[in-house]
Amino acid sequence: MRKSKEKGRSGSTRPPQLKKPEWVKMRPEEVEELVVSLYRKGYPPSMIGVILRDQYGIPMVKAVTGKSVLQILRERGLAPEIPEDLMNLMKRAIRVRKHLEEHPKDYHSKRGLQLIESKIHRLVKYYKREGILPPDWKYEPSKIALYT
């Protein structure tokens, strides 16, 4: 079983230059307020970008405001403690662990869990190095259920 890195090639192409398109009529402050209100409604940062693209016609938040969605949330003190990609991987690991409790002989899922947890450890190392997670933060599957 390979580490699945080649999946998901489809997706919209990013604009070649980071400039505000002419058709976007919203001011940067309005876009920032939209980002904050969507986050308060419970949408994660990745979904906020998709919603702004699909429903409001804003192709890239950074092109309009000069800041990414996470930068806007950090300025307002709203950014999540644990980065979204890491949280999603941890939720996946919890689901696989729960499955393995019921089906302990499922060796394919055991291997999948190993791959997921390896990816978690690599991400944690990166986030500690970048200062996003505290240096003493540790991935412990038993305690992670409290975060999710």
UniProtKB/Swiss-Prot annotation:
Pfam families: Ribosomal_S13_N, Ribosomal_S15. GO terms for cellular component: cytosolic small ribosomal subunit. CDD domains: Ribosomal_S15p_S13e. It comes from the Archaea. SUPFAM superfamilies: S15/NS1 RNA-binding domain. Gene3D superfamilies: 4.10.860.130, S15/NS1, RNA-binding (1.10.287.10). Keywords: Ribonucleoprotein, Ribosomal protein. InterPro entries: Ribosomal_uS15 (IPR000589), Ribosomal_uS15_arc_euk (IPR023029), Ribosomal_uS15_N (IPR012606), uS15_NS1_RNA-bd_sf (IPR009068). GO terms for biological process: translation. One of its GO terms (molecular function) is structural constituent of ribosome. The keyword Ribonucleoprotein applies. Residues 1-23 are annotated as: Disordered. Belongs to the universal ribosomal protein uS15 family. NCBIfam families: PRK08561.1. Part of the 30S ribosomal subunit. PANTHER family: RIBOSOMAL PROTEIN S15P/S13E, SMALL RIBOSOMAL SUBUNIT PROTEIN US15. This is Small ribosomal subunit protein uS15. It comes from Thermofilum pendens (strain DSM 2475 / Hrk 5).
